[in-house]
From Swiss-Prot:
Highest classification ranks of the organism: Eukaryota, Metazoa, Ecdysozoa, Nematoda, Chromadorea
Chief subcellular location: membrane
Organism: Caenorhabditis elegans
Function: May contribute to coordination of muscle contraction as regulatory subunit of a nonessential potassium channel complex. Plays a role in the formation of muscle connections, also called muscle arm extensions, between the body wall and the motor axons in the dorsal and ventral cord.
Name of the protein: Putative potassium channel regulatory protein unc-93
Alphabetical UniProt keywords: Cell membrane, Glycoprotein, Ion transport, Membrane, Potassium, Potassium transport, Transmembrane, Transmembrane helix, Transport
Length: 705
């Protein structure tokens, strides 16, 4: 009979931990060993061919981490904000159960006798008397103590009367840290978070380095850098030349759109104030035709004529639209608006196709992801185009200010009873001061503004025709027989039964309603009525600056905070502005409030323009960017058309209430999409509990099936 003594082995080896428990429960990139750490094995061969070993990766990771950690204050702010958002439930907590495993060489076994000498005698120190010992003596000897086998070796399975001859027996005691029975064994529990643990991760810096080293973004940068270094001189020069041409075409396209929409946005903001009901009706026709034609016309025009010719024809239609605005009548404005809406759908569709093709070509030359490059190019494009809102409004206000004598004197410090949310449907109910502020400008001044916008459109067409390069595939498409492609229309009908798509429709329509409110209601009932038509451009320029800056900033912020905080921020800002306009007794002396409301509205509009468009891309899929942009443009244009139609039939207060409830409905739909899986599971569970499944038929009934 062989016995195992206490000093011969480690006590915890007796627990007999299974081999499966030593593996990571959720293997990640950081929980693999040696060569498996190389980005999921499929890229390991490519990295080895490029000469990127483990040492090179670690060196590059340390260098990049040193560059990233130059501002610890910003890093602490980022971590604190993420933790607060997780506490409030705005973003989900990341659960990472991975265990870092490392492969080391086995340590050779060293016999203990060569280093230590066992004592020949053991002495037991006398114990201090305690009443607890009296109770222990009365216990039965055969009572099984928890964890006793950990301290008695293999003698636990034998008789208790056997005593070791050379070693004093040890009284079994309860181990609080026993991994099986101990009360203080490691259990998954929520730990208290202090400021120190908040600023510094629980894991050490080495683990964080490993997670960064073997991240796909980091490895993609190294692979791109290595592939560029391996290119020959001729190939590198040719690739750089093509990339410079692509970037120049992108900036040329952006500047041409800047001049075009400088004219269109500036004239659009004056329609309801200068042309009255004719202006709102023409905008309804324009955006309704844009929404409908976006399903059929753009694909046919692009395939038949190519992107560049589509741009030029659309610019010519915009030119005719502005010319007709010199002498606006119902018989001329409504048809011109319909054709302008069709041209708008074509020019936006051609823009998406042109930028997408440039992004794909640039990504192949620069060894980057196509989606990353396309999104970056769209960001550059809209950064330039949104500045057109600023320039166009500044042009109109500057020309109007030179001609209006009222602009020389300041606004009166009094409450305007017929302006703001109390703006009447019948203009005859306006006060004399409000009526003078909304008086149509002299024809010469209005013609001067339109001529300035015509010059911008001509410059846009010249830039597009002389400097923009045509796509190579446009020449191939023109040789093929073209016909109307109804694929997008069929896809639109097919996705009408998709629950997720329909849940996002109310928020997209609200995006159109809030734009129509700002262009058609705020410019007339608030700014024009209180300050005068000559001030509309200045206030809308403030909106344009805020919209452009926030559209540029909110794009990268989604990577830090996620989609939910940005949507909540935009909704809260819009709700506050709507409530403010509903209770604000308009006083023209409070000039700052007009600009603050426009700036805050621009912040919210920056959220909707960037995030809703990206949300449609996420739902539809990045493989069909054209269809995603078409769906977004369709529902947004439909919302704008509905908004301009409501201006004729409801008061300002009712319009604000409709916008308020549409925003609440849209946010409910957005929250339902974000928690769609949980809602479906709850719904199935509710149906299963309320309507249990029927018992299977017996053999007699099954014969009749």
């Amino acid at each position: 009979m062989k016995f195992q003594k206490m000093g011969d082995s480690n006590t915890w080896d007796l627990v007999g931990e299974q081999q499966q428990r030593k593996k990571s429960r959720s293997p990640s990139r950081a929980s693999r060993v040696d060569s498996e750490l190389l980005v999921g094995v499929e890229n390991a061969a490519e990295l080895e061919a490029l000469g990127l070993g483990k040492e090179q990766l670690e060196e590059e990771a340390r260098r990049h981490k040193k560059q990233r950690s130059k501002s610890p204050a910003l890093e602490n702010i980022r971590k604190t904000s993420i933790h607060l958002l997780q506490k409030f439930g705005a973003i989900p907590k990341k659960k990472d159960d991975s265990v870092l495993l490392f492969r080391f060489h086995d340590i050779p076994d060293i016999p203990l006798e060569s280093l230590c000498i066992r004592p020949k005698e053991f002495f037991e120190e006398p114990k201090v008397f305690s009443f607890r010992d009296m109770g222990r003596e009365q216990q039965k000897a055969e009572v099984n103590e928890k964890c006793s086998y950990l301290f008695r070796g293999t003698s636990f399975d034998h008789d208790d009367h056997f005593e070791l001859p050379t070693e004093t027996g040890r009284v079994p005691e309860y181990d609080h840290f026993c991994p099986i029975h101990g009360s203080r064994r490691r259990l998954p529990r929520n730990k208290l978070v202090t400021m120190q643990t908040l600023m510094h991760s629980v894991d050490d810096e080495d683990n964080e380095d490993l997670a960064y080293i073997y991240g796909h973004d980091f490895l993609a940068k190294l692979v791109r850098k290595k592939k560029r270094e391996m290119m020959s001189g001729t190939e590198k020069e040719r690739a750089n030349k093509i990339k410079r041409k692509i970037m120049s075409n992108l900036w040329i396209l952006s500047v041409a759109f800047l001049f075009l929409f400088t004219a269109f946005n500036g004239l659009q903001n004056l329609q309801t104030s200068v042309n009255g009901d004719l202006g709102s009706d023409s905008l309804v026709a324009l955006y309704l035709s844009l929404a409908i034609s976006s399903l059929f016309v753009p694909s046919f025009m692009i395939n038949r004529l190519g992107c560049k010719l589509t741009f030029l024809i659309a610019i010519f239609v915009y030119f005719l639209y502005i010319v007709i605005n010199l002498r606006p009548t119902y018989s001329s404005m409504i048809p011109a608006s319909i054709f302008c809406g069709i041209a708008a759908s074509c020019i936006w569709g051609a823009k998406c196709a042109y930028i997408t093709e440039m992004g794909i070509r640039y990504a192949s030359l620069n060894f980057e992801s196509q989606t990353t490059v396309i999104v970056r190019f769209f960001g550059y494009f809209f950064m330039i185009v949104h500045c057109g809102q600023v320039v166009g409004n500044m042009v109109s206000s500057y020309i109007f200010t030179l001609s209006y004598s009222q602009a020389l004197r300041g606004p009166e410090d009094s409450i305007y009873d017929s302006c703001g949310y109390q703006f009447p449907k019948n203009l005859s109910d306006l006060t004399e001061l409000a009526e003078s502020n909304l008086a149509r400008p002299p024809q010469k001044v209005y013609v001067a503004v339109c001529l300035a916008y015509l010059a911008c459109v001509i410059i846009s067409g010249m830039i597009m025709s002389m400097f923009l390069n045509a796509l190579a595939k446009d020449a191939r498409n023109r040789k093929m027989a073209q016909k109307f492609n109804s694929e997008i229309f069929y896809l639109m009908l097919k996705h009408l039964i998709n629950i997720k798509f329909m849940l996002l429709v109310p928020l997209t329509i609200f995006n159109g309603l809030e734009q129509a409110f700002l262009v058609g209601v705020y410019t007339k009932a608030f700014v024009g009525c209180g300050l005068g038509i000559w001030q509309i451009g200045f206030v809308m320029a403030c909106f344009g600056i805020s919209d452009a800056v926030c559209s540029l900033v909110f794009g990268p912020l989604i990577k830090l905070f996620g989609r939910m905080p940005l949507f909540v921020f935009g909704a809260v800002v819009n709700l506050l502005m709507i409530v403010t306009l509903m209770v604000w007794p308009l006083n023209a002396a409070d000039t700052q409030i007009f600009y603050v409301v426009a700036a805050m509205w621009g912040m919210a509009d920056g959220v909707w323009n960037t995030q809703i468009n990206g949300f449609w891309v996420a739902l539809v899929g990045r493989q069909s960017l054209q269809f995603a942009f078409t769906k977004y443009r369709f529902w947004e244009s439909l919302g704008i058309a509905i908004g301009f139609a409501l201006i004729r039939h409801v008061t300002v207060e009712i319009y604000l209430l409709i916008t308020f409830f549409m925003l609440l409905l849209g946010m409910c739909g957005f929250l339902a999409i974000e928690n769609f899986d949980h809602i479906i599971k709850f719904w199935h569970h509710l149906i299963h509990t309320s309507c249990p499944e029927k018992e299977p038929l017996d053999d007699r009934n099954s014969d009749f099936e």
